[in-house]
């Protein structure tokens, strides 16, 4: 019932609807933010219900459960067993199991969010080394919502994921005071999405997420 299931999606939709009905909020200024599993569900909602949100901020996010299953087998982290429980088996066990991996993996439908919701994707450069989710998940998620000219090359993604540093051909991102002492290393924007890799690990920088949402809210006034 967890891990990007229809029940989880329905619960989030219901929570937004409840807030709109019982609280005095601006219906066109609802934001979603999360990190790790919360960031993963931010990407799920971006792909499945972009119309509900003015902006979505996803940090240290998983974008492909099949890939993350193998990531965890290699790293020795036991999250792979949770994935198996959620999806009903290991990748390749059956067509039904593989379909569960597909429909619970936002990388397969994030393109639905392009042009429909503002999306901030961010993670620390050492995630996957000191943390549990390789940065390739965030970079490949960005590629799904980016214009073709702005997509990040697969070789560059593999290098950054493996080496936890920028390729020599990339310039370091401009400073951003909202990130404090964990400054951006890489930043790229395209259409209604942006990705930032910062000098950190598997974490959210609350001040940066809040500043991003405040900026979007100011634009809407």
For each of these PLM feature ranges, what is it?
Residues 18-22, 26-75:
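Primarily recognizes the serine-hydrolase "nucleophile elbow" in alpha/beta-hydrolase
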Residues 54-55, 61-62, 66-112, 162-179:
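Mobile cap/lid helix-loop segments that gate and shape the active-site cleft of serine hydrolases
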Residues 91, 125-191:
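Active-site-adjacent alpha-helix of alpha/beta-hydrolase-fold enzymes
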Residues 112-119, 189-193:
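Short, proline-enriched alpha-helix->beta-strand connector loops that line the catalytic pocket
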């Amino acid at each position: 019932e967890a891990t990007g299931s229809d029940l989880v999606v329905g619960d989030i939709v219901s929570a937004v609807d409840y807030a709109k009905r019982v609280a005095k909020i601006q219906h066109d200024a609802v934001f979603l933010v999360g990190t790790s599993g919360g960031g993963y569900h931010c990407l799920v909602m971006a792909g499945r219900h972009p119309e509900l949100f003015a902006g979505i901020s996803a940090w240290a996010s998983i974008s492909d459960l099949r890939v993350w299953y193998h990531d965890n087998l290699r790293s020795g982290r036991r999250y792979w067993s949770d994935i198996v429980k959620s999806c009903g088996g290991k990748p390749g066990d059956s067509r039904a199991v593989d379909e569960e991996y597909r429909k619970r993996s936002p990388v397969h439908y994030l393109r639905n969010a392009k042009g429909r919701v503002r999306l901030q994707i961010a993670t620390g450069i050492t995630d996957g080394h000191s943390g549990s989710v390789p940065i390739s998940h965030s970079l490949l998620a960005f590629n799904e919502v980016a214009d073709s000219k702005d997509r990040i090359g697969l070789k560059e993604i593999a290098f950054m994921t493996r080496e936890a540093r920028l390729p020599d051909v990339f310039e370091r991102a401009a400073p951003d005071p909202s990130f404090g002492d964990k400054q951006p290393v890489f930043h790229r924007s395209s259409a209604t999405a942006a990705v930032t890799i910062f000098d950190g690990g598997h974490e959210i920088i609350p001040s940066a997420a809040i500043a991003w949402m405040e900026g979007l809210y100011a634009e809407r006034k």
